[in-house]
Amino acid sequence: MKRLAATIASLFLITASSAEAQQPNVAGRGLSPEDVRRVAPALEKYTRDRLDDEVWNRPGLTPRDRSLVTIAALIARELTLPMPYYFGQALDTGVKPGEISEVITHLAFYSGLGNAFAAVGPARDVFAQRGIGPDQVPQASPPLLPLNEAAEADRATRVGGQFGAVFPGVVQYTTDVLFRDLWLRPDLAPRDRSLVTISALIANGQVAQLTGHIPIGMNNGLTQGEIAEAITHLAFYVGWPNVFSAMPIAKDIFEKRAR
């Protein structure tokens, strides 16, 4: 029932802009399943029967992975009202506090600093309620994971050749900050970084970027089935149009890799 109420809150806010979602009269409006039944009983039924009871129990992704996909979508869309519930659920399904911290940090670069800072408050409150202290989140500058020099050299050459002459600053920061630093931070596995990146891109309708990030994700250990199931899961949180925009790109990548 708690997940149902939180899901209803998140689906309610998905239709609001980020600015609207921050207005007190919206952010403070709690919706119980009973509230929804009084207005849209079918909506409450779909949420309970299809999303809560069915989608979250599908075998294609673990509950932990579904939690990562969901919190990535909420951060990407700056939907702060349901975050406390879903951060708590993430902890309950096996996501570590340090991994939540790293998801927030990671998505600052893929969804914007403002979205990341908006998630800090809800995460702080959940951590406080759970007795999670600063010693359980990653340090600012940990020893980094080893870099795949060949793969990074190929990526840097391609991006530099396309954009380096016109946007040298973006190209340099992409190399120095993202792929030689952020992606190598050890407290969120590369596979999970890819999962939350792909989820955030789909949530924000930035599907052109999937041509790069789905192959990276598969190289990092995501399977075709897991990516397909993440897209299925996201349909309920970010809308069918966003996933239908992503599906042709994902399908094309899957087919090319199978050749």
Predicted regions and their residues:
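Positively charged n-region of N-terminal signal peptides that target proteins for export
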Residues: 1-4
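Bacterial N-terminal signal peptides
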Residues: 7-16
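Acidic, glycine/proline-rich low-complexity segments that act as flexible tails and inter-domain linkers
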Residues: 21-65, 77, 84-88, 92, ...
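Short, structured motif recognition centered on aromatic/hydrophobic residues
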Residues: 66-74, 83, 103-104, 193-201, ...
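A short structural micro-motif
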Residues: 75, 93, 106-113, 202, ...
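Winged helix-turn-helix DNA-binding recognition segment
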Residues: 95-100
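Preference for long, well-ordered alpha-helical segments
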Residues: 115-116, 206, 226-245
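Glycine/small-residue-rich hydrophobic helix-like segments
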Residues: 204-224
